[in-house]
Amino acid sequence: LTVAKSTDRVDDLYDRMANLEKEHELIIVPTTCGTGSEVTNISIINRTTKGVKVGLVSPAMFADEAALVPGMLLSLPYPVFATSSIDAMVHAVESYLSPNACALSELFSEKALHLILSCWKDAVANGGKDAWKKHALEFLRASNYAGIAFGHAGCAAVHAMAYPLGGVHHIPHGQANQLMFADVMRKYQEKKPIGKLNQLEELLGAELDVEPVF
């Protein structure tokens, strides 16, 4: 609403999505480590009049400038950090599995997963709910890389089913993703247990030093 031309209502954004124009420069500085919005043309808005969260997609949503500032994360409550980093992880996983993935997007998915999982492991091993803060820049980079990946390849069933939980029941988006993630992966395994899912299992298993994870 701040940068859109001649628009003062959320509904107008959706009515004019195909022809949305910017009136001002859009500069994005992430304040969580989940959305990757600084590198995508997607914004998720809670349309309270409809009781749903809906994506707004337009070239006008691309940032003109963006900066990753680790200090912006340091005052985050732990639950906000946790759920937003889960969102980034799911972006990386779903984009990796996407039929629209390519070799380049897979590189960003894999790097995002490596950063998220290695930093989670270190934070758990070294104690306390604030231990993640020393990895603030790595979590921002992971969110950025996952944003690049899903901006190209898209997301899938986990996100699709998580949106109603947020829009109707007001469950934080990352938590909604977490609630859906394992069951969706298990269903994928039932439907097609070979191919990219095997590669993902090997990737996650190596990062976590465990047997296949689903």
Predicted regions: what they are:
Residues I44, H159-P164, M180, N198:
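Re-entrant/interfacial helical elements at transmembrane boundaries that shape
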Residues G34, Y145-G174:
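Glycine-rich phosphate/pyrophosphate-binding beta-alpha loops
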Residues L1-G71:
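Glycine/threonine-rich beta-strand-loop-alpha-helix active-site module
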Residues I42-A153:
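Carboxylate- and glycine-rich phosphate/diphosphate-binding segment that chelates Mg2+/Mn2+
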Residues V168-F214:
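Gly/Pro-rich interdomain helix-loop hinge
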